[in-house]
UniProtKB/Swiss-Prot annotation:
Protein name, UniProt field: Ubiquitin-ribosomal protein eS31x fusion protein
Crosslinked residue numbers (Glycyl lysine isopeptide (Gly-Lys) (interchain with K-? in acceptor proteins)): G76
Keywords: Cytoplasm, Isopeptide bond, Metal-binding, Nucleus, Ribonucleoprotein, Ribosomal protein, Zinc, Zinc-finger
Single GO molecular function: mRNA binding
Listed GO biological process terms: translation
Zinc finger (C4-type): 121-144
A UniProt-annotated Pfam family: ubiquitin
This protein's GO CC annotations: cytosol; cytosolic small ribosomal subunit; Golgi apparatus; nucleus
Natural source organism: Arabidopsis thaliana
Gene responsible for this protein: RPS27AC
Length: 157
C-alpha cells in the first residue's frame, strides 16, 4: 500500500509499505529518500507520536494515510551554576512565650481591686483588648492611629 509522509518544509514523500511493517522500517525508508537519520525522526499520525517497535496496523494506518515528520529536538535548558552564599543565613527571631503575660497589663491595689496599667483604645473599630502604646508625651493606638497628647503644666495653648 502507499502512504504519504509530509515533512516540515511542506514536501510530501510517497512510500510503498505494508500494514505489517514496523515504524522502524518506515523511518529507514525515509532515511533512504531524505537522508535524515532515524534517531532524529519523529512520526506523528492522528496527533500521536508513533513508537518504533509497533506496526502500521497497530495505529490503524491505512492506504493513502498521511504521516507528519518532525525532527527530534536535542538538549534542554542551560545548566545553571549552584549558588554560593558568602554570608551565613540570618537566624530568625524565636518568639519567647511568657506564661500569664497578660498580668503585666493589670495591677491589684491594696483593697483587692484590679486596675488597668495600660489605656485601652475607645475607638469602635479597634474592639476590646486593644491597648494604646504609652509614650513619654502621649498615648497612641497602633491599629487606628488615635493619639492622646498630655497637657504640660504651665503651658497655655
Amino acid at each position: 500500500m502507499q502512504i504519504f509522509v509530509k515533512t516540515l518544509t511542506g514536501k510530501t514523500i510517497t512510500l510503498e509499505v505494508e500494514s505489517s511493517d514496523t515504524i522502524d522500517n518506515v523511518k529507514a525508508k525515509i532515511q533512504d529518500k531524505e537522508g535524515i537519520p532515524p534517531d532524529q525522526q519523529r512520526l506523528i499520525f492522528a496527533g500521536k507520536q508513533l513508537e518504533d517497535g509497533r506496526t502500521l496496523a497497530d495505529y490503524n494506518i491505512q492506504k493513502e494515510s498521511t504521516l507528519h515528520l518532525v525532527l527530534r529536538l536535542r538538549g534542554g535548558a542551560k545548566k545553571r551554576k549552584k549558588k554560593t552564599y558568602t554570608k551565613p543565613k540570618k537566624i530568625k527571631h524565636k518568639h519567647k512565650k511568657v506564661k500569664l503575660a497578660v498580668l503585666q497589663f493589670y495591677k491589684i491595689d491594696g483593697s483587692g481591686k484590679v486596675q488597668r496599667l495600660r489605656k485601652e483604645c475607645p475607638n469602635a473599630t479597634c474592639g476590646a483588648g486593644t491597648f494604646m502604646a504609652s509614650h513619654f508625651d502621649r498615648h497612641y493606638c497602633g491599629k487606628c492611629g488615635l493619639t492622646y497628647v498630655y497637657q504640660k503644666e504651665g503651658v497655655e495653648a
